[in-house]
Structure formats: C-alpha cells, structure tokens
C-alpha cells in the first residue's frame, strides 16, 4: 500500500525524512497540519493503565480531541525527542505550503503517482487506518474532532465508492474466467 511505501522507503535527504515522519504521524493521528505544528510534549499523556494519549484542541473548531497513540506515532515522537532545534515543539514541522512542496518529493521517492498534500494524512487516518479496520464511526468522529458525525460519514462514502470501483475493476479482469450453468434454472 501507499502508506507502507511511505513508512518503509529510505529518504535520501534529512529534510525529506523529517517531512515523511511528520506526515506519517498525521496519518496515524488524524491531525491537521496546524494542529501537528502546535504540539508539545505536554500534549502527550500516559494514563494509569499505561495507554499513551495525544490530547489537544483542534485549531479549526476548538474541539478537544483525545487520540490513543498507536506504536508508529509513538516511535516518531521518540525519534525526535530532545532535538534542540524543535524549540519545545514535539515534531519538526514546516509551513503547510513548504510541507506540501516537500511531500511532492517524498511521493516521487516512494513511487506514489499522485500529488500528496498534508491534508491527505487526515483523510488516510479516517479511511485507511481507522474506518477500513473496523473502528466505529463515532470513535473516528471523536478523534477527528468532528462536531457532526455527517462530516465523518463523507469518509465512509469514499470507502464505499472505492470498494465499488475495486470490485468493478476485478469484474473486468476476471470476466470470462468463471461461468455458471444456467440452462436448468427457471426464471
């Protein structure tokens, strides 16, 4: 998958590695660029059961979001922990426009034939990471900071559209490979 390619591809330049890491972090947290850029270590909380959480306010809506952190975002945080040039920030972020420029290079390096934008990370979290893996829509809505579940349902429609497209492509590929005898069936 494209997400696997992003995670596993070796980046030849430090700036591209940092960009890729921040983008992958967003793919696994669903945060918008401005929200990732504002994170500090104070946003990371470990509860009494040992679960690591990311707690922040969405800049766009002021909604509080609590996101249980999977292993990949935790590893990315550890990778950049203590870097002096972060000036107290959690991750090495750039402006949104500069990030999108670097993401074009990251996509080429990973063999992804589309223009990556930072907002695609949020979309990837909603579709590829959560909804496609059975996370309930209500939980996804809460983690994305959606006030209205209808906003989250847009992502679910994208998944249904993609499923239909994939099955239609499959039907085209296997057309004629299988047949069923219908002469004895009364209609």
Region locations from a protein language model:
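C-terminal catalytic core of tyrosine-transesterase DNA break-rejoin enzymes
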Residues: 24, 28, 34-35, 105, ...
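Basic, Lys/Arg- and aromatic-enriched nucleic-acid-binding interface segment
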Residues: 1-33, 133
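Conserved tyrosine-mediated DNA breakage-rejoining catalytic core shared by Y-recombinases
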Residues: 1-7, 38-78
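C-terminal secondary-structure termini that scaffold catalytic or DNA-interacting sites
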Residues: 83, 170-187
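Catalytic-site neighborhood detector that most strongly recognizes the C-terminal catalytic loop/helix
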Residues: 58-62, 96, 144-169
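Short basic/aromatic active-site micro-motif
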Residues: 18-22, 93-97, 113-133
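Acidic, low-complexity interaction regions
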Residues: 94-97, 105, 110, 182-187
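C-terminal catalytic core of Y-nucleophile DNA break-rejoin enzymes
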Residues: 59-78, 84-105
């Amino acid at each position: 998958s494209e997400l696997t390619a992003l995670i596993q591809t070796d980046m030849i330049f430090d700036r591209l590695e940092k960009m890729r890491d921040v983008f992958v972090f967003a793919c696994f947290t669903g945060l918008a660029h401005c929200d990732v850029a504002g994170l500090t270590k104070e946003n990371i909380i470990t509860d009494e059961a040992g679960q690591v959480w990311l707690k922040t306010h969405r800049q766009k809506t002021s909604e509080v979001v609590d996101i249980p952190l999977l292993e990949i975002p935790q590893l990315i945080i550890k990778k950049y922990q203590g870097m002096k040039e972060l000036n107290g920030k959690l991750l090495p972020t750039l402006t949104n426009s500069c990030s999108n420029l670097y993401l074009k290079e990251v996509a080429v390096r990973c063999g992804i034939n589309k223009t990556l934008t930072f907002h695609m990370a949020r979309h990837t979290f909603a579709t590829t990471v959560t909804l496609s893996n059975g996370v309930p829509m209500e939980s996804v809505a809460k983690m994305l900071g959606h006030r209205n579940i209808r906003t989250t349902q847009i992502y679910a429609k994208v998944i249904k559209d993609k499923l239909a497209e994939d099955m239609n492509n499959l039907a085209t590929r296997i057309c004629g490979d299988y047949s069923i005898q219908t002469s004895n069936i009364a209609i």
